[in-house]
Amino acid sequence: MTLYDENNLHIIKDNLRYLKLLSKQYPSISSASSEIINLQAILNLPKGTEHFISDVHGEYESFTHMLKNASGVIKRKIDDVFGTSLRECDKKNLATLIYYPEQKLDLIKKSEKNLEDWYKITLYRLIRLCQIVSSKYTRSKVRKSLPSDFAYIIEELLNEQGDRVDKQEYYNSIIETIIDIDRASEFIIAISNVIQRLVVDKLHIIGDIYDRGPGAEIIIEALSKHHSIDIQWGNHDIVWMGAAAGCEACIANVIRISLRYANLSTLEDGYGINLLPLATFAMDFYKEDNCENFKPRTIDKNLNETDIKLLSKMHKAISIIQFKLEGKIIKRRPEFKMEERLLLDKINIKEGTLNLNEKIYKLIDTNFPTLDKENPYELNERERDLVEKLTNSFINSEKLQRHIKFLYSNGSLYLKYNSNLLYHGCIPLNEDGSLKEVTLCKETLKGKSLLDKLDRLAREAYFFKKDPESKLYGMDMMWYLWCGPNSPLFGKKKMTTFERYFLDDKNTHKEQKNPYYKYRNDEKMCTMIFEEFELDADNSHIINGHIPVKTKEGENPIKANGKLLVIDGGFCKAYQPQTGIAGYTLIYNSYGLLLTSHEPFSSIHKAIVEGNDILSSTTILEHVSSRKRVLDTDSGEEIKKQIHDLEMLLVAYRKGLIKEENEANIRF
């Protein structure tokens, strides 16, 4: 406790106004003292487990399972608690029951001959496991995690030892009564959910919830129910956020990507976006065009020829609209320095060629029915009407707006948390490895100041509805964050979408990465970034996503001698043949850092019926000799400040600077 005497009493007097407010919450020496004791005890608890996941790309089945099994944490807890006293098949079944209690119980009820015995054994096991996973938390925190229906019973069972002679009958009778009154199934579901909740104290999603997968909206719905989460926006998230804000270029990009991968379920079923006007438009303008280069890329999708033809026409129609809308932004914002992406005016329709960087290329598709040679970036009347309808659909989708507000409320471009720096893409660098200076709004920025400014502009794009000029600039910046040359989310010099559709020469398809990726193995670069973000280089890590780790080719996700960790989740099935695995996740618990690599997930159905889990292997990156405590974390720093304030309040009471409330008044 800080000792205050006559020499430093002025500190308390300077803070007297604040301390009087604090005294409303702690109106006596007794209440302030109790809170200090409580907070001091919390500081000495083990730090909670953090779970890091990145690049989900809409693959909701794999993600849902990863969330439920906490990247193998639950299985490790089962091993720790039961060791060799349980067969491997029993451990597997117990784990599956915790992941999917409702579905697994339905199967067990059909197959188990002596259900009462099974209930009794399972309840004892679940309670024992829950006692272990809850042991690092205060009773108050555990109590808040319990479902109201069973809160009292679970709390009693967690705080009683079934092997204590004086309480054994009491403990056993609770379990027997649960079974006798036919509430065992509901209790198993409740305690399984409590275990799932308590094994992970904090969830970090390092970008790209959205993309080509079929269930981004399912993922966000699940995340919105999570007890403690933060999100670092990815490039695919930002383009959806821009679309929800009303940025027309972002809307066109979102629709184009969905059509490219024949994934319309998120748009149509998830968010109720009406694509019929686009289908009508595409059939009118591209009726005789087979749109060969716009056929959707499909994995595990059975589409008939009619569907493919329609999707191809819609895909081409929205792509041309996208290039026009992007051209308007590039012309409106010369500070973006993206003039080389103005390609529509470089097309020679008569010759069927494109002048790209003073070199002539043959176009593989020369049908541009909506292109005006004199004004190639102008939308025709039908296109303008279509864009307005699509924009209204995005702006008026209640579910989309709710989900995007969730991303804003819980997300940011980067996060400093417990000495780790989390961001999705990169910190823009020059070729020599120094921080890249970027001019925005007449300010020249780099590193942390650049990301802080971009974060503010992204919020203005959505929330500045009464300031049209600021909102428009923010929306243009959202598009820049998606594909701009100095975007920390994109991390490349240019996005060659047009070239991939219209040119055969593969050299024109290349997208040069920011020099950041060249220096990822350089400890000096990491140290420079830590200093820029005011972190201790000796005790910090950069946790990064965005670029899949090509494990098959021998690439290591651990960079710069462990200073930088790449955990692209690898959920996207299209990348798995290139990477050789289904990506990496990270666990940071009180014992250290564990990097887990995962094999591809089969399906939730197989996980429930056959007990198939994601096959994972874990690498211990750092192991501490003494467990990290809450006092070693960011939360610990906040608690220390609270304790300091309460200590000042105690002195203020004892010196008579603030009067205690009458005990009778406090009680009544």
From Swiss-Prot:
Its cofactor is Mn(2+). The keyword Ribosomal protein does not apply. Keywords: Carbohydrate metabolism, Hydrolase, Manganese. It catalyses: beta-D-fructose 1,6-bisphosphate + H2O = beta-D-fructose 6-phosphate + phosphate. Belongs to the FBPase class 3 family. GO terms for biological process: gluconeogenesis. InterPro entries: FBPtase_class3 (IPR009164), Metallo-depent_PP-like (IPR029052). Pathway: Carbohydrate biosynthesis; gluconeogenesis. Its EC number is 3.1.3.11. This is Fructose-1,6-bisphosphatase class 3. It is an enzyme of class 3 (hydrolase). GO terms for molecular function: fructose 1,6-bisphosphate 1-phosphatase activity. The keyword Hydrolase applies. The gene is fbp.
